Amino acid sequence: MTFKMKKIISLFALAAFVLVGFSSCDYDGKDDAYVTHYVSIDLKEGDTYLVAKGSTYTDPGYTATEGTEDVTSKVTVSGDVDANKMGIYNVTYSAVNKDGFSASVTRKVLVYDPEVTTNISGTYKVTSTDGSQSVFDRYSVIGNSVTLTQLAPGLYSISDYWAGLYAVTIGYGAAYACTGYFAFGKDNSITGISSSDPWNNKMTSVTGSYDPETGKVKMDVIISYHLVMELAK
């Protein structure tokens, strides 16, 4: 037998040994993949909860699971609610899973005034901007639309505290509106609660009033700019 033939036979024998060796190993169907389960938090009564002004706020509850395991006891709740003051309060529920990954959800608690019966919801047009900064002379917002939406008696959202300055007049689009919330009192007064815009400006003040005879809304807004606007349907 030649050396070449011996080499070929040896290679076949080695291959057979390797095959037998692999076939004799137990395969349990598992691999090195690992799945982590984030904590899933479910809010009872949903992510928006109404509380009447002057009543007592009690958290409506929540449950949490990590995979199939109940981990409700691991949830941390943060955020205060003043049931004596109209406003929109954020309550956050958070938890960390066994691998150190965090998850959270937020509930908006709306403290409303049941004594407020007037609803000023609607889409209004800007009819004047008297007393405003000169930027509103260079970029007129007259004729732009502003939508007020009642969330609960005495609580409203506003589509744009800047009356469409960037969103419409300058033409950047709705993403550049200054949205927000305000409280509406039974005396027809308006008080700003919060605002949000792409530049994260802080609300200095928002005051105003509604005239039930004319149906007009007047707002004095100071959020980066000073805008005094009258709105009419």
What is each of the regions a protein language model found here?
Residues 2-47, 116:
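Bacterial Sec-dependent N-terminal signal peptides
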Residues 69-102, 111-112:
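Serine/threonine-rich, repeat-prone extracellular segments and beta-strand-based repeat modules
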Residues 103-109, 229-230:
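Edge beta-strands of extracellular beta-sandwich domains
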Residues 115-233:
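Ser/Thr/Gly/Pro-rich, low-complexity flexible regions
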